[in-house]
Amino acid sequence: MRLRGKTVASWRILLSVLTLAAAVQAKDEPTIKVTTIKHPPLNLNYFEDSNTVLYQDISERNLYRSEDAGITWDRVKDIPDNQASLLTMHSFDKNRAYVLTQGTEHFKTTDRGKSWQKFSSGAPPNIFMGGDILHFHAGDPDRVIFNGADCIGIFCDLITLYTTDNFKSKAKFLRGNTEGCYWAKSSDLFTTGKDDLDKQRILCVVRDNFSPFKEDNRLLASDNYFQKVDNKVQEFEPDMDTNHGVQGVVSLAVVKKYLMVATSSLNTDEMGLFVTDDTIKWHRAMFPTSHGHKVNQGAYTVLESTNYSIQIDVMNTRPSNPTGVMFTSNSNGTFFTENLEHTNRNTNGHVDFEKITGVQGIFMVNVVQNWEEVEKDTNRGGKHVQKEIVSKITFDDGRTFHDLKSGGDQLHLHSVTDLDNVGRVFSSPAPGLVLAIGNKGKSLGKFGDGDVYVSDDAGVTWKKALDGPHKYEFGDLGSILVAVKDSHKEDIGEIRYSLDHGESWKTAPLPDDLKIKPELLTTTQDSTSLKFLLVGKTGGDNPKFHIIALDFEGLHERTCKEDDFEDWHARLDENGKPSCLMGHKQTYRRRKKTADCFLNQEFKDPVPVTEDCECTDADFECDYNFIRDGDNCKKAGPIIAPDNVCKNARPDDTFKGSSGWRKIPGNTCKRKSGDQKDDPVERKCSEAVNAPAAPADGKIKAVQHVFKTDFKDFEKIYLERGESSTEVDETIIVRPVEYSGNSMRADNQIWRTKDHGKNWERILQDEDVRGIYPHSFFKDVVFFTTDSKKVLYTIDRAEHFHSFEAPTKPGSGNPLSFHPDKKDWLIWVGEKCEKVNGKETCFTEASISRDRGDNWKTAMRYVQKCEFTGHSAYRYRDLRQIVCLAHKEENNEKDNPKVIVSSNDFFDEDKTFHQDRVKNFALMAEFIVVAAEDQEKQGLRALASLDGVSYAEAHFPVNFKVSHQNAYTVLDSSTHAVNLFVATETAEGRRYGSIIKSNSNGTSYVMSAQAVNCNDQYYVDFEKIPGLEGVALINTVANRDKRNEPKKVQTQISHNDGSQWAFLPPPKADVDGKSYSCSSTEGDEKCALHLHHYTERSDKRKTFSAATAVGLMFGNGNVGSSLSSLKEADTFMTTDAGITWKNVKKGAWTWQYGDQGSIVVLVQRASRENPVKTKMISYTTDEGKTWKDFAFTDKEVTVLDISTLRSGASRNFLIWCKDDGGETFSVNVDFTGLADRPCKSDEGSSDYYLWSPKHPSQPDNCLFGHVSQYLRKKDDANCYNDARVQHLYQVENCTCTRADYECDYNYELGTDKQCKLVPGTSPISAEQWCKENPDAVEYYEPTGFRRIPLTTCIGNGHNELDKQSKAHPCAGKEDEFERRRRTSGIAIFFAVVIPFGLAGAIGWWVYRNWNGKIGQIRLGESSSLDNDAPWVKYPVIALSAVVAVAAALPLVASALWRRATSAYESVSGGGGGGGSWLSGRGNRRFTTRDSFARGRGDYAVVDDDEGELLGDDSDEEV
């Protein structure tokens, strides 16, 4: 079973089946009545313990009801026609149900649908949550949570409301920015242990106010409905991970008595599973270390668990032909042990697993017998290795497994992966009775060749019941079995039934010679009824559906008496006597199979009698990290020590730990006196999980490794770890290379280290690797191409390697594109050649794989490139969306222009052409930026798209002319705007240009900076500082009017996202205390600090700062009027984000950040200008106040590079060197000996202090409307950061001031600092503004000011400079305008609690959205334009932020039988198409107006592949 975040009362409550009936009665036969309808009856639900049934007509959006088990049906008249969008049954009250509409008025019943009352939710349903709109309290049926969405156009704010009176009054606002809220008491079995908490505790998955990414979601709890006390929301974050909360919460699910939370993080698809049985004490789910099992997204399934443990199946093979491993937890859901390997799964994550209802400890599972062949399967030739599947059964909850037997033959059964009906696959509440479809033999055959088998002893013995596959059901607690033969044709005209446990069968014809294709067969949830529903289909392509009611009440005249019953024992020994199962004997009273009577006890469930046994060896299993070895349990990993044991101990200290055995969870056996099998034994602390580390000795260690190569450089791929990863390695893959211009030669030696360079080993020695391509988003994954179609890859950090065959040979560029959310989705662009009539034609072809290369589908031919543009953070795009640059016609003719082509379904049916004569496109943050020819103006035009479907042309500032020679470079864009560099001087050696910045949809541009320096390849001296809002550095050309002189370059900084630029203030003296030749307090054009920038870096990834080192920057440069040569440069640093600088080293030193900014290492790197040699590094642990030297080698060497994890989180560094003898080697420098204590952030005794950035010209710390406080480690704290520090500690909003506004479009700043209309222009019109902002409801008459969207300042009307004029509705939005004028509690929440326009901040947006690359993208061709145009006076328009979305990946999918529509489609062969259940269409809206990326200083994760330079390849020829 797969869960979706909510517990359901019974498996049948969420199933879909229907019936309208007309009766035909025959003597000694069941009564059969047929109702014929136009549309499939979906979402059929029985009210528990009744014959009342509901179903939905999805097409007509109506609800139908029957109160006689489907004989007669009536449309529910209390609900208006065409309003019923979603039927939801109350999970804990068998008389209640709800029908949701698309609006805010919905319907409920408390009397099993006899009457329906309207209720108000206060917001429309949140369609992004599928069917999980309502969540019910298990102890009080009146308490209901409603997950809604407040939408305007495509913009949605996700909110949650609640009721404590079953919506008798209007729903109350609970919380905003939610991805789902849940009552803690969400199942009958779960309890917090306190009545008041059970009653009111609510847990919400909450998105970060400043981030749209799921990796920043958090779990927050409240015991008073998130109400405010003293203006502070009463909520707290549970300490899920020992003593702190966990980011990246994507889902929550209640499983029996456990509450599970799944978390995700950047760089990995490994998830963290956290479990609690009281919401107070949490544990991370721990899996055995012996086989390295991990819980990855989309690769694990929470099975139907027990009241005493959780069972999970984890996929461990290729996704296209998967198998899994099954685990069972201990009693608190924390420590999992392995039950069974090689379980059979399908690509949807369904597992062949089912428990026998009502009998503890028995379940059936299918395993793959030829698993070795399946695991080696490479799908060569398009054919997979066929699985040989065999069935197993366990009677001790997975400790041991046995074959199924029919007679003396082995029996194999079709299970969940071959689901043929709704409901459970095998069993029902009928004690001991099991039906299945299967076959005898060595392994499972085809479903169509299977027969029906029956067992009446809970699966111990089986016998054949019917020929061929059937759909089947149980009634009257097993007194009657009903079956209908399966068929893909409309040729079934009878049903079959048995009154003696399947020994004999009778037939009954359908009335009026009706012949159907059976779709499903069902009955009441508890299988106590004698009434059944059969749904069939006729009519071929114009189908009709028949709901057939079957009533067997007249077959037996009498009700069973005591003599008609027998004791049935769940387990018998070899002598036929009751034996112990899970520590007890279990006995049911059930009808004898030969008795000619019915129980007639509708809705009364069977109750077993149990008797506990004394414990034996059979009641124990191997404990966590122990594996069975004969009669013993052998240690296979570290041992769990009790809390607070071994924390400050020495390795040889001891504790009482596991003996290797544990009592099977749920086993009820009575312990004997004396020693027990699971008594703790003496263990050493060195054997424990998190064993004590060696104490810090205060020493730095260096380890050298020599590479036998003639090459002098290395291609280095650091595999970053995700926060949710259980790995602790620091893996690097390197190979020696040599760069020459834009080309690279590689030595075919590939090395791997798992410990950051202390030890190295060769990998892939027998393979001829051509290219190495790390996955852009999942850092555990790396691909290796060859000169053939063979592609090698690893998904576990180079631990194991696999291969697939690509559809074409790789071309000259990067052949792979990756999806940001789906690890296994790939696009391959390669070269294909066809020979026709002796002439060979070659072209590039794009192919798509959704299973990591096992299967490929051709997407397009004659393409230049394709990219996945779907992203979970952008719900306005389909997750499957792909955008390609391709030739308009499928040929290589010169006059064949390129176009943009998009698809939202992998090019299956949707294939849309956009624009013409396109030069290139680039992805940057949420934008798709396109450069196309403008034939009319003989130049280039820029276009942008947010949704990948609509491409709007860019409008440049007044008089901004773009000629055919202009070159566009898309710069790092991280504030919901395109930063576009346009070259204005194109003479070689003199190139520079302007940076213009777009509005929120990428279409309207204004000036940000002019005369910005670029090199001859149009790379630009522009860099945003990661981790902080609004800080950027540029280099400008000061002497642009003197074309015959070399460039005079100056450095400038912006602290407000490019609205203003200033020089860097020079330090007063150098590191030796000597004054500089000039001085300036703030920096000016005559005296300032100037830094060597992006265009001069041999490695473009060497940035001034790292996001984890908040506020710290280093640079090489000089003090003076302009930038001097690198040979004359010294090294400078700042600790306050560039407001003040100091000289720390003479000469140009290169730097790396470690331990999240707590360690900075400098070394003198050799360059052509300065071929220096050294043997020393210099480091600081106190933000540069003091520096210490360390000799990493005995003699001076040439340092080629220094590297570490790009996130700056490691305490290890690698120095790459070459000695005088030409030998190339690396030196690992390990700083872990400096500290052995993890830093604490406890209030009162914290190792951190709070630091706030500021603007140098503003008196307070308000920047962009708020004061941000960041955590930084104290200088004297002798500790290390053991987890990712949440640097952004808190944000407090300020009152709006003039600094929060800028001049509106077509306005310029006057001498009086007021915004005045540019002569000859007009203010933007209402029509134009509403057209450019299609989701806006209202328009304000222009005041000349507009709010800087980065600001979060709080306005009150009087201080809002952009709203001191009259508001008007946009055309067609008058009603919404009026509605929004009426302020509600929810409106106040959005206006105050979540400030308008929380803007994106600089740092990590680009790293997370632009394929993990850093750098710049060039579009189009080079050009020139007038540099004296009047637009240079325009202030920049900081952008209106565009919406992005946090994606809530489900923890696990719903139980196969719990999804109404999908269940019906799975058995009917339906599906496809798709669209929202609410809208009936596929147009999805997205969230939110208020969620934007904010730099928090903890996401400086940069790929090792450089930002691509995407130029015009002059109509490439292949």
Swiss-Prot record:
Residues on Cytoplasmic side: 1407-1435
BNR repeat ranges, renumbered to this chain: 64-74, 107-118, 453-464, 496-506, 751-761, 848-857, 1132-1142, 1179-1188
A GO cellular-component term linked to this record: Golgi apparatus
Lipoprotein as UniProt keyword: no
Residues carrying covalently attached carbohydrate according to the record: N307, N332, N1001, N1293
Keyword terms of this UniProt record: Glycoprotein, Golgi apparatus, Membrane, Protein transport, Receptor, Repeat, Signal, Transmembrane, Transmembrane helix, Transport
UniProt-recorded name of the protein: Vacuolar protein sorting/targeting protein 10
Subcellular locations according to the entry: Golgi apparatus, trans-Golgi network membrane; Prevacuolar compartment membrane
Lineage summary: Eukaryota, Fungi, Dikarya, Ascomycota, Pezizomycotina
Organism for this UniProt entry: Colletotrichum graminicola (strain M1.001 / M2 / FGSC 10212) (Maize anthracnose fungus)
Region of interest (Disordered), ranges: 657-681
Signal peptide segment: 1-26
Coiled-coil features, chain-numbered ranges: none
Membrane-side (Lumenal) residue stretches: 27-1385, 1457-1518
